Amino acid sequence: MALFALRRLLLALPLLLGITFVSYVVISLAPGGPLDFLTPEDPNASVEVKERLIQEFGLDQPIHVQYWQWLKRAVRLDFGRSFLPDGRPVLTKIGERLPITLFLNLIEMAIIVGLAVPIGVLSATRQYSLYDKITTLFVFVGFATPDFWLALLLMILFGVQLGWLPISGLRSLNWEYLSFWQQQWDFFSHLVLPIVVATFGGLAGFSRYMRQSMLEVVRQDYVQTARAKGLSERVVISKHALRNALLPVVTILALALPGLIGGSVIIESIFAIPGMGQLMVQSVFSRDYPVVMGNLVIVATLTLVANLVADITYGLVDPRIRFGGRRRGR
């Protein structure tokens, strides 16, 4: 297993290098540039000022030279400074947004897993029942409902029409004047709509995966043997079928790791949540190349790490993978 992990890690390095190079080239060749955002309404900006900014940002060099200079800094975890007038380090801007995105997505993932597993198990063990039909309908609705449409619908209903919940940000304008418990309630109320929207589609997908996985497991011979021995259905499902049915779900959870850091671009933009997703959108529209590349590197690295973690985890929970790899190695 250690040799397998090392081999996959070594293969991931050139892949990460290729991802960063292609991303850098695509971003550099995109229409417009940072100067279009820095001096859009200044017709008196002299040619000398623009040339100075171009030289300062290194935009006058060929793309491969710019990429090499960026790569040398990135290896030292120095992603440069933002092209915006504040000129703040990229890691500083990302560090300010990362805890918010991580907190929201961890809550979302915990809710999805906590609800999807029992929903999927019950749907599989009661196949074609009324419960199974209702959950199947919910899954189809969840897959077909766009996040942005659901977000706007809930904002209009609960925020505008009923006035029950706030629709943007993480705290109200008068937050500093509230008592401690009022501040906690205010923060919680701001989380309700984003978390509901984020978990709706994910819950539909995970519960469907769990149902399909459980259906495949309960048809296996060892499950039928456990039933033939007279074990109760509860024991058969909980002790014999559930563990093996969770294998695909473990893989999916590992692959969801990049999303915990990358954030949801749509949800954070609609609800004005200052997270990684909103930072990515703002950086793209302002052509802030260093921040865009910093986000892409983090997401790409986590994607490769997630694939490695998924493979290792699958081998740990499924002995057939470990012993099969040993036999092939011999």
Predicted regions and their residues:
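Short hydrophobic, aromatic-rich alpha-helical segments embedded in or entering the lipid bilayer
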Residues: 45-78, 223, 272-283
